[in-house]
Amino acid sequence: LQSVSALTETYEDVKRDLETKLVLIAVQDDIPVGSVRLEIRDDHTAYLSRFGVRTTNQNSGIGKSIMHLADRLMLKHGVKQIHLHTCSTVFSLIRFYYGRGFYIDSTDKSRGYVRALLIKDYDRTPVLDTKIF
């Protein structure tokens, strides 16, 4: 199993992403509890990475709120399709993303595990204009 890139990021890697990507951070009681990074590309697609919610705050709606805000921002920026990779054998992750309108496009084992490419087409999946928080 190759190393998980999120665990080997350097300060410079994080700094570069903060400067070049859209980074959303959920804060509760002045403590960061969730975040996501979004790279908007010239071809009207985006790549979602480093999405996570603090373990003690999972299943509280924070992840759904982050994803809903990400959807609204992607539409505002003219994004037609968003992509992400995740481990395809973790049912809770796949279920979460399916619930947000993603589907599995393909899988590979290039990183030592079954990694799924998930896609969400905004033309096919409406984003409900509901309250974010």
Where are these regions (language model features)?
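Conserved GNAT acetyl-CoA-binding A-motif
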Residues: 67, 74-86
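Hydrophobic beta-strand residues of extracellular immunoglobulin-like
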Residues: 22-25, 116
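Conserved GNAT-fold acetyl-CoA-binding loop/helix
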Residues: 1-16
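Conserved acetyl-CoA-binding loop-helix of GNAT-fold acetyltransferases
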Residues: 53, 59-72, 95-99
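Terminal substrate-recognition subdomain of acyl/acetyltransferases
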Residues: 113-133
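A conserved beta-turn-beta hairpin within the catalytic core of GNAT-like acetyltransferases
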Residues: 40-49, 58, 77-80, 110-114
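Conserved beta-strand in the GNAT
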Residues: 25, 31-39, 47-52
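Conserved beta-strand-loop-alpha-helix junction that forms the acyl-donor binding cleft
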Residues: 83-94, 109-115
